[in-house]
Each structure stands twice: as structure tokens, then as C-alpha cells.
């Protein structure tokens, strides 16, 4: 981790976690910098922290009063960083561990929403290997990784135009 910028406000010390090592690193850096700029205008002591593998050490050294979580995708939104912050006893902005983990898992989220009476689009889970020889549907469909954020790994497939092997080989390794 790297402390990217520290401001000298009078208020609480806020560490803005950004960057990280997910596929959404770049957008997280932009979000984190925007959050930092907004907080600086409000009398906070802002510490910009690019969350790398030494994030535990850096947070332990910096001892912020609170962490503003601007991490995106895996590790930032899946309950991992939330669990780490709870273990370190550092308050943070974001949903808790369980809510984050459930929200990041598309299949479990869909199950919870459906069982709560909320309408959801039709869908089912398929392994990447299930796309090697045939299409699971005859009409156009969307493939999305079960545990990525934003539009990472989203593919629109037209079975009439895209051979199954090409679809499977074009899929990133983030699909199982």
C-alpha cells in the first residue's frame, strides 16, 4: 500500500482506500480521488491509501479514525476488506461483511431477491466448460461472472453468430 496524499485538516483522520488489485483498480483510483477531494473540503484529515498487499501494516501504522472504502470489485465490495477492517477494529463506510459478500454473489442475490418477492430476470448458473460445445439457449443471452462488479466479464452472445468454442475461449479466466 502507498499513502498517496495526506491533508492537514483539523477533524477526524479518514483513510480513503482506493486502487487495490481487482480488475476495477483504475475506476477505484478515480473514485477514491474524488472522495478525497470532497472530504478535504469538509475539514477532515484525509489520507489517500492505495490498498496493496501491505494494507494491514499501513492501516496499523496510520491508525485512521475511519476508513472510506472506495475500493471496487473483488476484495473491495465482497466482504473481504470489510472483514479485515472489523478485525482491525477500524470503523468504515460500506455495508458489513455478510451484506457485501451476499451482494457480490449474483446467484445468491438473485435467490434472496426472488424469495423476497422482487422481480428478477430469468437466469441460471453455468460453468465456462458448459459453453465449450453448445449454447445453453437458442436466443441471444448475456454471460456475467458470478462474483465480479460493474460490467467486468459481461458478454452478449448471439447463438446464431457466435460459435460455442469461440464464446468459451473469449471468456476471461474470471469465469470458472
Features from the language model and the residues they span:
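ATP-grasp fold ATP-binding core
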Residues: 113-114, 137-156, 174-176
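Conserved ATP-binding module of the ATP-grasp superfamily
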Residues: 46, 120, 152-176
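Intrinsically disordered, low-complexity boundary segments flanking structured domains
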Residues: 128-132, 141-143, 171
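ATP-binding N-terminal substructure of ATP-dependent carboxylate-amine bond-forming enzymes
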Residues: 1-115, 127-134
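Intrinsic-disorder/low-complexity coil detector
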Residues: 11, 63, 135, 139, ...
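Short acidic/polar capping segments at secondary-structure boundaries
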Residues: 98, 126-131, 146-150, 160-163
Amino acid at each position: 500500500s502507498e499513502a498517496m496524499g495526506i491533508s492537514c485538516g483539523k477533524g477526524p483522520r479518514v483513510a480513503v482506500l482506493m486502487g487495490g488489485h481487482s480488475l476495477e483498480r483504475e475506476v477505484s483510483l478515480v473514485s477514491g480521488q474524488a472522495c478525497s477531494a470532497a472530504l478535504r473540503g469538509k475539514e477532515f484529515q484525509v489520507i489517500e491509501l492505495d490498498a496493496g498487499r501491505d494494507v494491514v501494516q499501513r492501516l496499523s501504522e496510520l491508525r485512521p479514525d475511519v476508513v472510506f472504502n472506495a475500493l471496487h470489485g473483488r476484495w473491495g465490495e465482497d466482504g473481504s476488506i470489510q472483514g479485515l477492517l472489523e478485525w482491525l477494529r477500524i470503523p468504515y463506510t460500506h455495508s458489513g461483511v455478510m451484506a457485501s459478500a451476499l451482494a457480490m454473489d449474483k446467484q445468491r442475490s438473485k435467490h434472496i431477491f426472488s424469495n423476497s418477492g422482487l422481480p428478477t430476470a430469468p437466469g441460471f448458473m453455468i460453468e465456462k466448460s458448459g459453453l465449450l460445445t453448445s449454447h445453453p439457449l437458442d436466443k441471444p443471452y448475456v454471460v456475467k461472472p458470478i462474483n465480479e462488479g460493474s460490467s467486468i466479464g459481461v458478454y452478449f452472445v448471439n447463438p446464431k453468430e457466435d460459435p460455442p468454442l469461440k464464446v468459451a475461449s473469449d471468456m476471461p479466466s474470471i469465469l470458472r
